[in-house]
Amino acid sequence: MTDYKATLNLPDTAFPMKAGLPQREPQILQRWDSIGLYQKLREIGKDRPKFVLHDGPPYANGKIHIGHALNKILKDMIVRSKTLAGFDAPYVPGWDCHGLPIEHKVEVTHGKHLSADRTRELCREYAAEQIEGQKTEFIRLGVLGDWDNPYKTMNFANEAGEIRALAEMVKQGFVFKGLKPVNWCFDCGSALAEAEVEYADKKSQTIDVAFPVADEAKLAAAFGLASLTKPAAIVIWTTTPWTIPANQALNIHPEFKYALVDTGERLLVLAEELVESCLKRYNLEGSVVATAQGSALELINFRHPFYDRLSPIYLADYVELGAGTGVVHSSPAYGEDDFVTCKRYGMVNDDILTPVQSNGVYVESLPFFGGQFIWKANPAIVEKLSEVGALMHTETISHSYMHCWRHKTPLIYRATAQWFVGMDKQPSTGEPLRERALKAIEDTKFVPAWGQARLHAMIANRPDWCISRQRNWGVPIPFFLHKQTGELHPRTVELMEEVAKRVEQQGIEAWFKLDAAELLGAEADQYDKIADTLDVWFDSGTTHWHVLRGSHDIGHATGPRADLYLEGSDQHRGWFHSSLLTGCAIDNHAPYRELLTHGFTVDENGRKMSKSLGNTIEPEKVNNTLGADILRLWVSATDYSGEMAVSEQILQRSADAYRRIRNTARFLLSNLSGFDPARDLLASEDMLALDRWAVDRTLLLQRELEEHYSEYRFWNVYSKVHNFCVQELGGFYLDIIKDRQYTTGANSVARRSCQTALFHISEALVRWIAPILAFTADEIWQYLPGERNESVMLNGWYQGLSELPEGTELDRAYWDRVMAVKASVNKELENQRTAKVIGGNLQAEVTLYADEGLSADLGKLGDELRFVLITSAASVVPFAQAPAEAVATEVEGLKLKVVKSGHAKCGRCWHFRADVGSHPEHPEICSRCVDNLSGQGEVRHYA
């Protein structure tokens, strides 16, 4: 028996079937580094239009988690796809380096005894060490960027740039000093930004407290009475007993009705709607004597329960009827709404009582409670209220309360002298900041679109931005304040530039070591040099100034406006927010044209990731077991607009999908064996009809993919590429061409046509997957035939695809109909295999009973129909002649019948044909194979 295997064009490639990504990816990273891939991209892109994705800096602390990996991979997919689309898309990674978490780490490691200078020195060392660790992890994910020259907010140039950004805002009149309640953490000893606040359940003691009336006649008149017949009091309800010593007013709603209730011993003022629930809570019976509109009670004075001072009634719209008494006790130093209301009624800063110190302890001079920590003083305050007869009720409730994101301890609002960026303050020119920012939001594109309304609501309702902190590790606020007037030095902006120049050379230490006389000369003894540092959100929020037009100068020629900022949904109140405010203050527009928000990672059951639940996924572990490309494929396959589910099982599914794509690539490469595009590539018009369709289908898909990439719809890219590999290629085209590829002459038109199509498909596919499967695409690139440059990323989308000309007889619609017929035939062939009627598809002969239109279509393929259906014989018969046993199909006007071939099997092509053995020299093969071996070779026209 002759072995005809050597006469076949069998697939052959060195491209490995087994990916071995954990071992192979580091080798590819080394190659990218050795060829200077990022620098090469900058060189070839210098004359291209620019696309700037500005990196939101992760914090330089700890190992990266799955959220970091997701974020960086998304950014990398955009940068790579924009590069392929013909843009110069630089990517400068950055790090946020200052702030409390690093200072806290240093304190934990070295103790709190350190000097401020030593603290800063150790913080700088710690941040640098953390950056190196994170950088290695990000590079391992295949993220392409300027890793040798990232930006760091602690770089001297960036610290100086931040001071210059602040100077711009001072110059334009946005910055002011004020006393305002800010989020305060006793453990941090500092104000916190909104983004540093998280909410958790807390048990609090609630109290109902009676404030005796001081203006009895006015209260009587307000309720339409000649006089009061017995003692009267107004009742407040609060969850913060510790604020009672700082009470300075009582707030009621101007539109609510208030009742004067006779309870026997005294009269109580309560919101009419809450009388019943309050009396029940106090275990009292009573009757309403009179009612009055809230506005009628304005400015009536009541007495503090245990201090000799008055608390007037102020009207406030924020009072609610959901709980309590309808009366809110007001401590302007410890509540935002209280502060605003008291200021509206003319209270000046010097009149505001601030008995709580930065460590949470009352000042020693406070009667009854001096020297006590506020949380521990609560029982003593309740006892005092009970002692003076003011306590109506107390109970403990559990409610959501603000906590420090770092220490997990409860926060308070605390009025302190701080520096603010005014939201509604009139600048030297133009509109106030809030107005500017709201306009800028309208000019910004949001992905997903709901982000616009979210950010708009935050900006519309936010208070002034407190930018000062009382910490050591931060960029200084280099102000000199007059000792007598408290005013800024008249040359503040000029002095800030002098400080910035020094910081540029020596870092922030230059300010802290500066002797004021060096800048102020003889004036130095008249001014205080302040020690406050900037909110870290100001650090990252001004990177558009000190990175894009500063340390790295990667903005557009028209200015430092990025095309895209991309971060998690929490950054609407973080980096997106602070960047918007600084951009609008300095440049009067947002520093970005588009904002993309991604959701948070959850496990497959929708639960948040946490070490306690044991459901975290560590990027390093995935890299070392499955490979970074699997993680990248998961990112691409997941809709980032909501929560993103990830687990070991989900990643395993990504690995399965990866194998299908890799196997497709391997099939393409192995069937390009011996193909030299410079020698063997056919013109489109010389190719077979099916091959021309395959190239046309590839072109249509590429157009769709380019659009999906430009809109950042990576999950659509993934699904369409995966479906193309599995269905159009694996389930149709690649299956059909195997016979022609393997059995026809090595240099025949039939085979070269097929290889030309495979070459075009490969060139397109390798680029499609390059933004997602960064490592695998570059690996494939090395195995493609023909001369080529060093990396797929040094190219654009493939331009060698040709469209089917208009008027082509076998057009797209034609092949769609053929695919539908083939799917129906495959279904019946599978049934016959299951029933063991046939062993394989080539053992089948199929008769198609088709209506007139379909019959004409199928007839165009002639004898080549059998190659399309991958059966040994195929015939088309009029639909009316279908016998009873013919199988109906989902294709209208088509029935079919499959029978087992009665002919011998060709030992070379495996088709069952009547002419097997008809050639005496080759008794084991069919005449087609004989012709391909020793004759002119078969001629194919269609498939």
UniProtKB/Swiss-Prot annotation:
Catalytic reaction(s) noted: tRNA(Ile) + L-isoleucine + ATP = L-isoleucyl-tRNA(Ile) + AMP + diphosphate
Pfam families: Anticodon_1 (PF08264), tRNA-synt_1 (PF00133), zf-FPG_IleRS (PF06827)
Cofactor(s) essential for the protein: Zn(2+)
Binding of Zn(2+), residues: C906, C909, C926, C929
Enzyme class (EC, first level): ligase
E.C. code: 6.1.1.5
Keywords for this protein: Aminoacyl-tRNA synthetase, ATP-binding, Cytoplasm, Ligase, Metal-binding, Nucleotide-binding, Protein biosynthesis, Zinc
Record's GO cellular component terms: cytosol
UniProt short sequence motif 'HIGH' region, positions renumbered to this chain: 58-68
Binding site for ATP: K611
Entry GO MF terms: aminoacyl-tRNA deacylase activity; ATP binding; isoleucine-tRNA ligase activity; tRNA binding; zinc ion binding
Cofactor remark: Binds 1 zinc ion per subunit.
Signal sequence bounds: none
GO biological process assignments: isoleucyl-tRNA aminoacylation
Motif ('KMSKS' region): 608-612
NCBIfam families in UniProt: ileS
Function: Catalyzes the attachment of isoleucine to tRNA(Ile). As IleRS can inadvertently accommodate and process structurally similar amino acids such as valine, to avoid such errors it has two additional distinct tRNA(Ile)-dependent editing activities. One activity is designated as 'pretransfer' editing and involves the hydrolysis of activated Val-AMP. The other activity is designated 'posttransfer' editing and involves deacylation of mischarged Val-tRNA(Ile).
Family per similarity comment: Belongs to the class-I aminoacyl-tRNA synthetase family. IleS type 1 subfamily.
Protein name: Isoleucine--tRNA ligase
Organism: Pseudomonas putida (strain ATCC 700007 / DSM 6899 / JCM 31910 / BCRC 17059 / LMG 24140 / F1)
Lineage: Bacteria, Pseudomonadati, Pseudomonadota, Gammaproteobacteria, Pseudomonadales
